[in-house]
Amino acid sequence: YKKIMDGYRADAYTAYASGVFRDVKNELFVLDQLYIRTGIRIQVPSNSEHRFIGYKSVAFREEFDEMTKQGTAVVDIGGGNLQVTLFADGRVVTTQHMVLGTMRLREQLSGIRQAVAHYENQIEELVNKDLEVFKSLYLKDNKIKSVIFMGDYIMDLMKKVEKKGNKIMAAEKFVKAMRKLYKKNAEQIASELDLSHENDPLLILYIVLYTRITEELNAEEIWAPGVNVSDGMAYDYAERHKIIRPTHNFDEDILSAAKQLSKRYEGFSPHIDALTSMSVLVFDAMKKVHGMGRRERILLQTAAILHDCGKYVSLAHGPECAYHIIMESEIIGLTHLERQIVACAVFYNTYPLEDYEELADRLDQNSYMTVAKLSAMLRVSNAMDRSHKQKFKNVKASVRGKQ
């Protein structure tokens, strides 16, 4: 990789390692040795960061915004887990990851593969349990028309079924073709798909996952855009360095996911709307004082939307519950650190902010200062509507002198 960069005289790069690195005990030592030998700094993204980068590779396609208006699921299948992001009316409904990665399934079934006649049935039984729970929780009010698949072999499978090379196909046609492949072993399937690695034990696992997800979501069509996380990395780099202009509003995805999470935990919408508007008003009026930018503004809005979600679990310990709900919920578009900032801002909206030393294991100094500023704005804004009756209207905010 270093030689290729030198050959092209590249003077900038971004290098990522798989999330598998996080499961390795000597992660820091391995990354250090890689840097010493190559001079390349490698980042290990969290699951949410990894999936968001992959999601970006699909979202910049022209078809994406139109497709998500009618109920769509973006399904990213990897070795460690499976990520499903639901869209309705062009907005994010939820994003959930399940421990149904092909490598993990293979490990669970490694002891029985040779002992059972219908290996694919055993895979289905493992997969069905989690898919049925997901369906009962999130698909009651959401009709899925389209499924967008990201993962290995999907393009090969699409070419097998759709000879014309179309990337969009009827779900029923796809499922019927996959069910026929079930009856064959990995070598026969690889031969039909013209794959070079005939003995890949993950091939059947991918086929079963694609088939069962399509069936369980009851989709009308599937789309395989033929992109992967590498495309997302290139898009993310180009967007951050203003080489290209984003075609999709990712900030709206964050706020939409936060609103859906608040709705799930019975947030009181009139108060949340009032608090969000008030906190943004304070933020904008004090830009020269706090020195924060657009990204922190999004974090403040997210914190305002989710500040009361913990009361669904406990009225007495709402802030603690809200903190844990936010930390355990994936909000597409937020990094793990940003989710930590939002959770802490919500927590310290109620409780006094602790010294940095108490939070140093969770936040760096810059993040700590962001939490301090956001939680202060949240407290002021919350105090304006403490009765939850929205007594203030047409509020304006300005800085006078030092106040």
Describe the role of every protein-language-model region.
Residues 2-8, 20-25, 30, 36-70, ...:
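Helical "lid/coupling" subdomains associated with nucleotide-phosphate turnover
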Residues 71-75:
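Two-metal-ion RNase H-like nuclease active-site motif
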Residues 78-81:
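Active-site-adjacent helix-turn-beta-strand microarchitecture at beta-sheet edges
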Residues 12-13:
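Post-signal peptide N-terminal segment of secreted/secretory-pathway proteins
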